[in-house]
Amino acid sequence: MYLDVKKINKENFSKFGQLISTKNVKSENINTNTTKSFYDLVNVQILGNDNQCRINIFKGKKRQFPLHINMLENHPFSSQAFIPLQKTTFIVVVAPISKIPNLNSIEAFKIPSEEGINFSPKVWHFPL
């Protein structure tokens, strides 16, 4: 199966999570105009008994294409955000929430440089 990689936007990604972007969102200059603050970009969700929010940094290796999708994973108790630390684009492969991933509903999205994504809890995705 080959997937077409879609250009991401807030609407077409909404069933999987949120696009993280500073474009066209409310911002405010703070700290005597030395910093621009962008508010309320994502909804971090923590479910279950372990109600701690953790921030991790992952260093991913560049993938070779065509990419063989041989597994999907999900995180049943929390959302998961990916925001590149360098100017780079990346591709995410996702499937809607279900008990097991529906291979007929897999979608791929290209995330532009300087943007990120936040997977909702239980959304299936290929590991980055």
Positions of PLM-derived features:
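Non-catalytic, conserved peripheral segments adjacent to functional cores
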Residues: 1-108
